[in-house]
Amino acid sequence: MKITLHQANQGDCLLLTARDGTTLLVDGGMKGSYRKHVARSIGTMARTGTQIDLVCVSHIDRDHINGILQLMDDLAAWRVFDYQRGSGNTIFPCPKGIRPPAVRAIWHNAFKDQVAEESGGRPSDSGGSRRG
């Protein structure tokens, strides 16, 4: 397994690549560090046709989630661009951000699940861990 630690200022951002090529992006750091460091690195994945199999958000603190939110914004902007160009709109502007790779799935540590676990309450229906 290959582990790539991205500069994320106060937060975290790791890219895990398994031997079989499966990729997992854990957190995204701050928005600025995502744009400056992470987007460039994962942009090479898009150029080679490699996708991110799973994006994992450990929790919703801004130093972990803001980079992922920027990734989602970039993905949406490029999808709109591709649609417009594919529909013959040749004057539609190219997005400013680096094209990110496709993302197959997203997982997040939901607040509802955390509260249920910490309070000893019933686990949520959203797939959180369950106590026996």
Where are these regions (language model features)?
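Flexible, acidic/histidine-containing loops and adjacent segments that form or flank the divalent-metal
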Residues: 1, 66, 70-132
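Conserved beta-strand hairpin/beta-sheet module of binuclear metal-dependent hydrolase folds
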Residues: 1-54
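Active-site environment of divalent metal-dependent phosphoester hydrolases
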Residues: 10-12, 31-33, 60-66, 112-116
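Extended aliphatic helical segments
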Residues: 26, 38, 55-57, 80, ...
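Low-complexity, flexible helical/coil segments
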Residues: 39-42, 60-64, 89-94
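Metallo-beta-lactamase
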Residues: 52-63, 86
